[in-house]
Amino acid sequence: MIYKTLDKNDYLKYHNTLIGKDFKFSKVAIGMWDFMKAWEDWPPRVLELNGNILSVCFMKISGQAKSKVLFISNIFTPASGRGKGSAREMLHRNILEAVEAGATSIRLDCNKSALGFYDKLGMTYWGTTISHSMFCDLPINDKGVECFKQTTNMSSLEILNSYPQELRNAKIKWIMKKVKKHKEFDFEHPSRYNEFMKCFFDDKNTITT
């Protein structure tokens, strides 16, 4: 599979070849690129095989130096790419690109319709957001999607303490902002919210400062 970017004109040409739900999903993605004015700075990433596009993704790297974060949204796999591991490979390539650019973590809101995909990767969640998606903010490295298997067995405390102090404090504030007031429980996809809060109130579990 070839991992590359498309400019706006090429993506719109591709978009116009789609039908049904694929067309509708792609149209939403186009609206996001337009709204964020991201066509030049963060053009669509695509996976291509034999001239056929198997997966499309919006990604953005934000922050400076050691605080760079990979944002992922709208991993879109059209009918022609389903059942081929395209979405997994797309996310893997996104992470490798981001790590090479200096990113140390990934942040995304996981829609519940896509949780089966993220669960298989070993992803864990800090809690439920106001939009009822599961919030993920985890460290990444040059192992790509395999890095999630490493964090699966780590406690929330271990994950937070794996970051440099200045980044750790920002992570804590962001997690609190995203999930503090939304304690909805999903027993099939449990979150780290209670364990995360315990880090602040249990003398045995102290976040390193």
Question: Where are the language model's segments positioned?
Answer:
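C-terminal "cap" of GNAT-fold acetyltransferases
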Residues: 111, 131-209
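Conserved beta-strand in the GNAT
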Residues: 46, 52-62, 69-76
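Conserved active-site alpha-helix within GNAT-family acetyltransferase domains
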Residues: 88, 100, 104, 111-135
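Conserved acetyl-CoA-binding loop-helix of GNAT-fold acetyltransferases
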Residues: 77, 83-96
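Active-site rim helix/loop that mediates acceptor-substrate recognition in acyltransferases
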Residues: 21-49, 56-58, 200
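A short beta-loop-alpha structural element at the N-terminal edge
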Residues: 1-15, 159
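Acidic/histidine-enriched, beta-strand-rich ligand/metal-binding domains
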Residues: 73-74, 82, 116-120
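Short alpha-helical
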Residues: 9, 53, 112-116
